[in-house]
Amino acid sequence: MKLTDDNYYGQAASEQYFSVSQYKDFMKCEAAALAKIQGEYNSPPTRAMLVGSFVDSFFEGTLDRFKCENPAIFTRKSELKAEFRKANEIICRIKDDSLFMQFMSGEKQKILTFEMFGVPWKMKMDSFSECICITDLKVVQNFRNLPLWRYDLQGAVYQKGAELCGYGKLPFYLAVATKERVPNLDIFQIPQMTLDIALREIEGNIEHFADVKRGFMEPEYCGVCDYCKSVKQARIRNYNELLEG
């Protein structure tokens, strides 16, 4: 299956390929990840995700289309809601920063497919500078929580994917803008040792996740996510459970 911008996020592509986001879904809850792949469950996009997509679309040159396709970002007076006015402010801040713009000057949304650890993968890079680096754009609340989102996993897959596709082993950077009152900007390089550790982690987990995806093993239910709550059956519990921990 040849992937394009039109079918990259489609169900058929999700069924055939692993991606970083799908891998992370399996890390959180195997049952929810499988239901999402099979088209039985879809978590609605959060406001934070829409803000990130708003900024992404500026670099892709599709901001006008994004606005047309997402009327919920506007008030009844056809003005941008507060979060998206902040996104506009972030874009203006980024445009004035030469280093940030340099890192985001590569080929936009380049798609690669490859086999890694015995399973097919797909990836889509925000900014690909051939022979130089891979850069991914992130719009976050603040810098402090950046490691909690496990972008090291993304960097590991993107670096290895580019290498397997013949582009060499390229450094991976995060071009990060914050949604603070005064937007902050910086470029973060994820160290090679961190990427190597993340890749080994993926190698250790992917066979099990692939077996669940293929139907060879039953998925585990985390019991706490929205999907698990939506399919659970009521049971009798001890009230004192709620007093523990």
Residues covered by each model-derived region:
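Metal-dependent nuclease catalytic cores that hydrolyze phosphodiester bonds in DNA/RNA
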Residues: 1-124, 234-243
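Short histidine-centered catalytic/ligand-binding loop motif
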Residues: 43-44, 76-79, 142-150, 191-193
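Hydrophobic (often cysteine-bearing) scaffold residues that line and stabilize catalytic clefts
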Residues: 47, 51, 154, 198
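Short amphipathic alpha-helical face segments that pack within enzyme cores
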Residues: 54, 153-161
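Hydrophobic/aromatic-lined pockets within catalytic cores
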Residues: 59-63, 139-142, 163, 167
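Metal-dependent nuclease catalytic regions and adjoining charged, substrate-binding loops involved
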Residues: 84, 147, 160-245
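Secondary-structure boundary elements
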Residues: 100-104, 129-134, 163-170
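Non-catalytic protein-protein interaction segments used by genome-maintenance enzymes to assemble
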Residues: 112-152
